[in-house]
Regions:
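Residues at the C-termini of beta-strands that transition into short coil/loop
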Residues: 63, 145-147, 249
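Phosphate-handling substructures
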Residues: 68-90, 133-208, 259
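Conserved anionic group-binding/transfer micro-motifs
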Residues: 95, 99, 116, 166, ...
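A short, well-structured juxtamembrane/interface segment
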Residues: 99-105, 203-210
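Active-site-adjacent alpha-helix immediately C-terminal to a catalytic or transition-state-stabilizing loop
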Residues: 125, 205-263
């Protein structure tokens, strides 16, 4: 596509090699990614390419089922966050029950998924395992912190388990952690400091990079199992209920990745 003979696979390799570098500071990541795209003369027409590629994909989103912090958040005021601020909360009994309706919706969609992307937070991983039986056996299951919940230094609910613990706990499952290389992955990318919240700009940058990654991957049918803020900031939407299954609007995804490409501080 580019006048230097770079293929889509070359672009995909570029993106994935960046993702595997250990999730360096997201702004530097973004700067380097666009610099590399410019070097291979793709940036001039990449927006049209991305729009075409995303138009060929069916992308579905499941928000994790109800978890312990959802119940407590509804009970206590935000300024009482110490009463509901549970680190890496698990699903409630109601949440476990909710996944049955998610499974039914998946059956009704009747989609053969090529790849499932899962947030590394426990509530998302649990949701995956509860619907796993209703997914086709040959789907790739990729765990990535690029679709973790937005990082706020005060909120323990979005701090998870160390990567080594995740790999050990799920070593006999289909979960693939190859794109996660950082032991402490739940802080602002590249800044392992409790005082460092992610901020909206960095959050949108990582989501835009993730959408770019999806666009250049070969899979057609994709499922994301993630969080409410991820959905709202990928789509022109006010929200999504726990365990709901939604087909994503690809035009909204194009807008988000275009914002990432155009962003300059």
């Amino acid at each position: 596509m580019g006048n230097k003979g770079y293929s889509d696979n070359d672009i995909l390799s570029l993106i994935e090699s960046s993702i595997k570098q250990g999730n360096a500071d997201i702004e530097k990541f973004h700067e380097n990614l666009l610099s590399n795209l410019n070097k291979i003369d793709k940036i001039k027409n990449i927006k049209a390419i991305i729009e075409k590629k995303l138009s060929e994909k069916n992308i579905y989103f499941i928000r994790h089922a109800e978890s312990e912090h959802n119940v407590l958040e509804a009970k206590y005021a935000y300024d009482e966050f110490e009463k509901w601020n549970i680190q890496d909360p698990k699903l409630t009994k109601k949440g476990i029950e909710q996944t049955k309706s998610a499974s039914e919706k998946l059956k009704n969609f009747n989609i053969h998924f090529d790849t499932v992307f899962v947030s590394p937070l426990t509530r998302a991983i649990q949701t995956y395992f509860l619907i796993e039986k209703d997914l086709n056996n040959d789907a790739k299951i990729i765990v990535t912190d690029f679709i973790k919940e937005v990082v706020n230094s005060q909120l323990d609910k979005n701090k998870g388990k160390k990567l080594s613990l995740l790999k050990e706990e799920y070593k006999n499952t289909k979960l693939d952690f190859q794109y996660m290389t950082k032991e402490i992955w739940w802080y602002n990318l590249g800044k392992e400091i409790d005082k460092e919240s992610e901020g909206q700009t960095n959050f949108l940058l990582r989501l835009g990079i993730f959408i770019l990654w999806m666009a250049f991957r070969p899979e057609k049918n994709i499922l994301l199992i993630s969080h409410s803020h991820v959905f709202v900031n990928m789509q022109e939407s006010f929200g999504i209920r726990n365990a709901d299954v939604v087909k994503m609007n690809n035009n909204d995804l194009v807008k988000k990745v275009n914002w990432m490409i155009n962003y300059s501080d």
